[in-house]
A protein has these predicted regions:
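Active-site beta3 strand of CheY-like receiver
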Residues: 49-55
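Short hydrophobic/Thr-rich beta-strand motif most characteristic of the beta2 strand and flanking loop
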Residues: 30-37, 45
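Alpha4 helix (beta4-alpha4-beta5 surface) of REC/receiver domains from two-component response regulators
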Residues: 67, 88-103, 109-112, 116
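Short amphipathic alpha-helix used as the core "switch/output" element in two-component signaling
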Residues: 44, 66-78
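Receiver (REC) domain active-site loop signature in two-component systems and cognate sites
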Residues: 60-61
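Acidic catalytic/metal-coordinating carboxylates
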Residues: 37-38, 64-67
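Non-catalytic signal-transmission and effector/linker regions of two-component phosphorelay proteins
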Residues: 1-10, 16-23, 112-126
Length: 126
């Protein structure tokens, strides 16, 4: 699967190995990727640059991904959110989707499924 446009995907995760692997995967198919481990820096960047897609972890020490998602809606309402987390909790999944997440993936998801989710979020009308 190849990214047809140069949409920007921002990653937010407190685990450097997840950031590196996810960035490498998205880079390999042509996405423009920005990676963050700090939720505040991520939100400041999103407010200034309005990324097309944000891939957000739920469990982070500074701020939960659900709180980040809520704040992101205020500063960059057009950014589509994908949750990528280790926490497979149906109530958290429901909250994220109800708050507007385009997709919810558990870490370890098949690369092709994750990439399809990012593509669908980047091109919601297709």
């Amino acid at each position: 699967m190849v990214a047809l446009n140069k949409e920007t995907v921002c990653l937010l995760d407190d685990d450097p190995s997840i950031l590196k692997a996810t960035r490498r995967l998205l880079d390999s198919v042509g996405w423009k990727v920005e990676a963050f481990s700090d939720p505040i820096a991520f939100l400041e960047h999103a407010a200034a640059h309005h990324p097309d897609v944000a891939v957000i972890d739920i469990l982070m020490p500074q701020m939960s991904g659900l709180e980040v998602q809520t704040r992101l809606r205020r500063v960059s309402p057009s950014t589509r959110v994908i949750v990528l987390t280790a926490k497979d909790d149906p109530s958290i999944r429901r909250m994220a989707i109800n708050a507007g997440a385009s997709a919810f993936f558990i870490k370890g998801v098949e690369s092709c499924d994750f990439l399809a989710g990012v593509k669908a979020a980047a091109d919601p009308g297709k």
